[in-house]
Amino acid sequence: LNMSLGDISELTTQILTASAADLANKGPMAELVVGLEMLHHMSPNIRHDLYYWVRHAKNSQAEVDYISSYLQGVVPVEVKADKQGGMKSLWSFMRNRKLHYAIRCSMENFGKFHYVDNEANGEVRHVRICPMYAVANIEEIKQGIEK
């Protein structure tokens, strides 16, 4: 991660080298690092804001870490501090907004997977995986998304 927003190399090192047990409470730090890196690699000529989605419902809460614009729509970006993690909130957001593509930033390598959403009559959701160390490539990953 090439960040010029102060010396966060220690934080980055902790996230990238921690064990699974260490990562239990590092989700918010991973989200922060990804958000700062996304801002760092956006056009410097325009003021950018980061957006997220939260649904507050009785006895449940759902959130998507970042909502990024692409062409005439949006692409949700989910951040996971490890290689695994549930994505019920992401599926809910995609279902409600009728979206088929998303990005997951995690400790995984580049890749993609497809999810058959049985709650939406078997619609297929496509997720591109962006390693946390490569958040600078999110714009390129979005360009590879088929609309």
Segments and roles (model prediction):
Residues 1-147:
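A cross-kingdom feature that marks ATP-driven nucleic-acid transaction machinery
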